[in-house]
Amino acid sequence: MGKIIGIDLGTTNSCVAVMQGTQPTVIENSEGNRTTPSMVAFTKTGDRLVGQAAKRQAITNPKNTIFSIKRFIGRKFDEVPNEKKIAPYEVVNEGGEARVKINDKTYSPQEVSAMILQKMKQTAEDFLGEKVTEAVITVPAYFNDAQRQATKDAGRIAGLEVKRIINEPTAAALAYGLDRKQTSEKVAVFDLGGGTFDISILELGDGVFEVKSTDGDTHLGGDDFDQKIIDFLADEFKKQEGVDLRNDAIALQRLKEAGEKAKVELSSRTDTEINLPFITATPEGPKHLVINLTRAKFEGMCSDLFDKILEPCRRAVKNSKVEMKDIDEIVLVGGSTRIPKVQALVKEFFGKEPNRSVNPDEVVAIGAAIQGGVLKGDVTDVLLLDVTPLSLGIETLGGVMTKLIDANTTIPTRKQEVFSTAGDNQTSVEVHVLQGERPLAVDNKTLGRFHLGDIPPAPRGMPQIEVTFDIDSNGILNVSAKDKATGKEQSIKIESSSKLTDAEVEKMKEDAKVHAEEDQKRKEEIEVKNSADSLIFSTEKQLSELGEKIPADKKPVIEGALEKLKDAHKNGTIESIKGAMDELSKVWGEVASNLYQAEAPGADAPEGQAPQDGGSKKGGEGAVENAEYEVIDGDGK
């Protein structure tokens, strides 16, 4: 008997998860992403593209690229006038049903949805290494029977036996683990996705969860916010240039992508610039679209959508017979809940901060996987002695990951290491906490970042910054950085640091093997450049300090070698940098031996090394590793 997978068939993105032992795992697709665009495209050569591949070519192939098909599934043609109007692909009436016409062939929404489900099925099969035939698929709580049945039909077309169709808010409640709490609680699940909105009030206790009421709007979601921006951009451009971009399918698709991007940016910024060069052309020449959009403007033009969100909330609370003050938690689900105004409305309406503990893009699929585990009988309460599956460390100079805790270390565990600054008078350091096996920080998973400031100005290599990693028996990672001179400390708590999917773990390990040679070369380049930088710094410092003590005939030679190294460091190859370093070290070594003899800082340095202030060696007592801060003790690495 194979696994029962859980699929969130979303309007904008879809996600698939499965139970691995007692834990749900979100499965990465073939592109390495945890969510897959719910898009299907047909090329001129007859190829069918699904997911990210379809999204990448949407701008150049808008009429043959299908998105937001969930808005059509289970609906009659006359029920989707607005959706039909804004879709760049052709929607036709076939027996009263909405169909999509591509290259003289019509497809039902169920068929298109099945193509997306097949992609999710294949993703799961690639991950599990076995055939998958059963699934739990989620739908909006406010989906009607026709939409539910159509979704089930899509599963059948995709070769899946749909064991259960469950509501997205119910799945979200499972995923958040709220049903496992011992005390009775009342919870509101607020689900605003790409095309639909649900609000459900649930009562949970003793592993039983009961839906008290549900409400929503199957015509309200992130697509509608995107459309507001699209209309704004089209209207502004028409005012400026007298051209309506809505009549150009390719321009319209570019507006759609720009609108979605602007919406996302406005979740973290107060304004954004939409810049679309060569958006169209007139007899006068090419035209470019450059428009600034503020968050306030965005919120103003979406005010009617925000109002539409509140009404279902009022109805749901009223119908649940639950007093507002008795609702214990508000769970946010769906990517559109990242919009700041939405979060503010939720807080204002319910009178408390919403729960943001799980990724809103993945929570529904996780819940579906848990439901699959329940149906399979695999979900049981198991206590495990855990280990950290991947190495933990921080980013150091040149983007290198310096490990503090190795993979498969039994927890609880604690590790300390001392670092220093990499620049003179550096008054703060950023601690970038990483997890993974790759040598470079960029290739590993970021767990968090924090800053330690107010470090007294001092030459580089002098301050001592003690970084501590502490993982308790619950798998909760605490990272702290302390300036040993001042006692000032900063810390960050990273919960579930080991909560990577098995897919992520295996992908990182495989990447580490496949890219080992490339990684090693890149790491060597960084190390050589770091060494060259240190040699340049120490040479300039010694030239300045020693001044006239350096023989007149030797000083130009040293300066020439120094300039050669600087040029190689800036423009040369690794081999040329090494050669220039050797040349400078040799020249400097001759001078240093005459000046300092045995007691000189660099007299006994190994070949290729010059006297260094702080250095970049690693391993022995007192060694320092150049970082944004530098290792200066011998513990561990």
UniProtKB/Swiss-Prot annotation:
Describe the task this protein carries out. Acts as a chaperone.
Classification via CDD domains: ASKHA_NBD_HSP70_DnaK-like
Region Disordered: start-end pairs: 598-637
> What PANTHER family does the record tag this protein with?
HEAT SHOCK PROTEIN 70KDA
> What turns on expression?
By stress conditions e.g. heat shock.
Annotated InterPro entries: ATPase_NBD, Chaperone_DnaK, Heat_shock_70_CS, HSP70_C_sf, HSP70_peptide-bd_sf, Hsp_70_fam
The answer to whether the entry has keyword Nucleotide-binding is yes
Keywords of this entry: ATP-binding, Chaperone, Nucleotide-binding, Phosphoprotein, Stress response
Family, according to the entry, reads as follows: Belongs to the heat shock protein 70 family.
- Organism superkingdom: Bacteria
The name under which this protein is listed is: Chaperone protein DnaK
Starting at the broadest rank, the lineage of the source organism is: Bacteria, Pseudomonadati, Chlorobiota, Chlorobiia, Chlorobiales
- Ranges of biased composition (kind: Acidic residues): 627-637
